Amino acid sequence: VYMSGXGKPPDVTGGEAHVAGKTVTYTXNPGYIMIGGAXLTYETGSLGGLPDIDDGKSFYGLLGKVPNRVGNSVTYSSQHGYYLLGKKTLTRLNHVGLPGGKPSALDNGMATIVXRXAIYKGNHGFYLVLPAGYPGTPGTPGPRGGPGDPGMPGEPGVGFPGVPGFPGSNGRNGMNGGYPGPKGEDGDIGPMGGKGEPGDPGLPGEYGV
């Protein structure tokens, strides 16, 4: 990071590094401390630029390489049937690269995001994560689920026996007896009795006069 007042970084090959693998090294003036990496390596394309991307639907991408000089800009345009979401023009502000990410293209008829999120590698050893696209439309609710399995039977209760009830009131006396019953039939003749005992001897007779 170049701090204001720390002196102008030295020019290297006219301020640009056009050969892949070439490294630019910065040092701070006396009394200042370097913040961030002191070396920037030119990898592919322009130093700090974004790669060319053309998905065939959204936008044409970059025509050529990203300008390497501070103050230069890149402008995007969408194809017929699409319109851009985000900044159409990106301007290089410092040696790190273009600010923000490329704009997305939205289909006029389908209202869906065409561009995908992408990760670009910065030439200073860090990774820039571009923002993801807008959220899509909610999906339709799924079918209603079937009934669940029957639950397990509950455990038996543990209540104690109830208190005995109080005695009931005395009942009323019953009515008097009913009508007299009919006369019973005659009984059977009993068996013959046994032989009687001999009688006592008679008294002596009296003499006649």
UniProtKB/Swiss-Prot annotation:
| Domain of life of the organism encoding this protein | Eukaryota
Disordered, as annotated region = 138-209
Intrachain S-S bonds: none
Any single GO BP term: extracellular matrix organization
Start and end residues of each stretch annotated as Triple-helical region? 130-209
Q: Name one GO cellular component term.
A: extracellular space
- MF-aspect GO terms: extracellular matrix structural constituent conferring tensile strength
Say yes or no: keyword Membrane present.
no
For bias type Gly residues, the affected ranges are 142-162
Q: Which UniProt keywords apply?
A: Collagen, Repeat
User: What is the designated name of this protein?
Assistant: Egg case collagen
